[in-house]
Amino acid sequence: MEPRLGPKAAALHLGWPFLLLWVSGLSYSVSSPASPSPSPVSRVRTSYNLGKTFLGLDKCNACIGTSICKKFFKEEIRFDNGLALHLGPPPDDLPSYSANYSDDFKTWRPVEISRLVSKQQNKISDGRICASAAAPKTCSIERVLRKTGRFQKWLQAKRLTPDLVRGLSSPLLRCPSQRLLDRVVRRYAEVADAGSIFMDHFTDRDKLRLLYTLAVNTHPVLLQIFPGAEGWPLPQYLGSCGRFLVSTSTSPLQEFYGAPPDQAADLAYQLLGVLESLRSNDLNYFFYFTHVDADMFGIFNNGHLFIRDASALGVIDRQEGSQAASGAGDNKDIFSCLVSGCQTKLPSCDTIPEKQNLVLVCSQVLPLLLQAKFPSPVQEEIDAELTRCADGTRPDPEVLGAASRLKDILRPLRTCDPRFAYRYPDCKYDDKF
């Protein structure tokens, strides 16, 4: 299948060099005789340099990584036609971009190109780094970060231990176990020869990239260590380039608020199932959200619901136990302050109840998906269980019970047809439908 290009874009065959030109604010007209075009070599060189700035490659190694950069420059990742139709620059402050991805130029699939944080937040973070060293606003942020006491400890470390991440603001690292941190190192996809719990194969550059990512946004790390291919409800991590990551594409749950009743019931049923898997799974990790909104959940084109944004997801190790972030305030440094105030106080992991995910989703997401969708008796039952599920003052068992009853109500409201390709045609042979 060819990528989704409009007629004008198809005629121009806008690949990565052209995309970089207008992404960086240049305009180039193939039909204007008024001014001669630059030579192809000059144009590609300029495109490459400007593209480095757009992607954040000029900020490396204060970035995510470079594992997928070749795909961009070989034109195996192309922006969606919504941008390709314009030769002027697209908005460069969007949180994400739709694109098409190919391994052979013959078959293409939709992907999402996402920033770790907003462009404005990047500017603030970079400014804080320079200010921490009393340096000019345009300092070498990599040089400043390399001189920090935390990174010097990372350079000497053979293994990623809890003391090396203590004080970072991410919920993933609020009370990490050694088992969890070993999993981070073993599955970190931005280095060659992944698989060991020791960091002997990490270069200085690799360590800085991992530390920066953990400090700014752990979403790409979670996609790597809990991959969808193993049954985790997360999209596939395809790689990163500069300060962007590439993952499989999903549509935000918010776009389905107007869905027909059977589809709304199916999505709500799936979402409750996802929350159940976060609470109870074979690896004995308890995943919890610090906050939720509809954009954090997404739907693949086969109807399957996943967690689209894992940046607000924390992990507590029930098997090994987590090392509490005691003394975290004594470990705060510039890495602790890149995306939040240095004075931000994080709640203890011991205070996270099992009901937390359900209370958040039942109060802030499901009502908008399920409101006024069903006949009166059924709708009243749904609303009643949603109210119980959203009540944070109730004990854990009562909230969990309300969620279970809500699933029981939703189950027979789902239908079996090709719109739900993730479970069709198997559902035809299931007596629950």
UniProtKB/Swiss-Prot annotation:
Keywords: Glycoprotein, Secreted, Signal. Its main location: secreted. GO terms for cellular component: extracellular region. It holds the Pfam family PIP49_C. Glycans are attached at residue 100. Belongs to the DIPK family. This is Divergent protein kinase domain 2B. The lineage of its organism: Eukaryota, Metazoa, Chordata, Craniata, Vertebrata. The gene is DIPK2B.
